[in-house]
């Protein structure tokens, strides 16, 4: 069931695993790069926005980006970012929580104006919707139990190691293509994969770096595990970046979102929000 709440104002594998470049991020705190795609020399113009309401949509359950808070209302990084965008634009907004697989169709049918739900920009998604500028980039990470003796992860270093991964994901495809000597162990859900690592049923876990960072920092992990190796940012598997999706041709809203995102980054508010949700560095 959809919740609504008001807001205040087949891939060819690369030749080797691709790790993130430090130059792709802005450092806002010692040792913690903040992802960003904004160039201060390319300041977008303030839009002539004639909207009075933006109907945001987000995913139902993808913490820490989207989830239902204790009161049942939408919460998470994407929700707070939408709230900040509305404040910057001085426009009223609403938020609907929908299943991820319904968001693109909902935009096309005018059931919402913008989807802020960690939807990766790719050739396929660009055919269906238009995107704001990216505001972060998908990243994959390995995690291991503390004391496992793995300080880095290379294909030859994890030969024969059992690696938990969510079945049917880009992470499984990447693991099978690049780490051919490892032993993937697919699980139906990320929660089951994390539990397997915490219990020592597998040697490693490979998955989304952001949700893993959230887990590692939370009580559920109980300090069991740490990141090892990476990060990995191969765009052919994990996407070119994550933007806010709008209906094809809605340039007025897309440009307004670009302006608001730049302003939030320029003021340091994006970095503040990032640090709130990711005290454990996903990179």
Where are these regions (language model features)?
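Proline/Glycine/Serine-rich low-complexity intrinsically disordered segments
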Residues: 2-3, 7, 21, 26-283
């Amino acid at each position: 069931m959809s919740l609504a709440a008001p807001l205040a104002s087949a891939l060819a594998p690369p030749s080797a695993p691709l790790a993130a470049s430090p130059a792709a991020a802005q450092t806002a705190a010692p040792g913690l790069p903040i992802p960003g795609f904004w160039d201060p020399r390319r300041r977008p113009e303030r839009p002539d926005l004639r909207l009075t309401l933006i109907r945001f949509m987000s995913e139902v359950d993808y913490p820490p980006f989207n989830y239902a808070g204790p009161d049942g209302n939408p919460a998470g990084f994407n929700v707070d970012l939408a709230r900040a965008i509305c404040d910057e634009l001085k426009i009223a907004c609403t938020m609907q929580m929908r299943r991820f697989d319904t968001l693109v169709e909902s935009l096309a049918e005018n059931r919402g104006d913008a989807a802020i739900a960690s939807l990766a920009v790719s050739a396929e998604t660009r055919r269906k919707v238009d995107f704001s500028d990216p505001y972060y980039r998908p990243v994959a990470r390995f995690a291991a139990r503390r004391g496992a003796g793995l300080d880095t992860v290379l294909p030859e270093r994890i030969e024969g190691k059992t690696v938990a991964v969510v079945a049917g994901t880009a992470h499984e495809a990447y693991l099978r293509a690049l780490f051919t000597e490892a032993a993937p162990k697919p699980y139906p859900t990320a929660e089951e994969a994390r539990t397997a690592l915490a219990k020592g049923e597998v040697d490693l876990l490979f998955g989304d770096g952001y949700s893993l960072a959230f887990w590692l920092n939370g009580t559920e992990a109980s300090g069991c595990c740490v990141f090892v190796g990476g990060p990995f940012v191969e765009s052919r598997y994990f996407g070119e970046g994550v933007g806010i999706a709008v209906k094809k041709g809605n340039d007025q809203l897309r440009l307004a979102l670009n302006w608001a995102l730049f302003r939030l980054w320029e003021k340091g508010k994006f970095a503040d929000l990032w640090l709130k949700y990711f005290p454990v560095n996903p990179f």
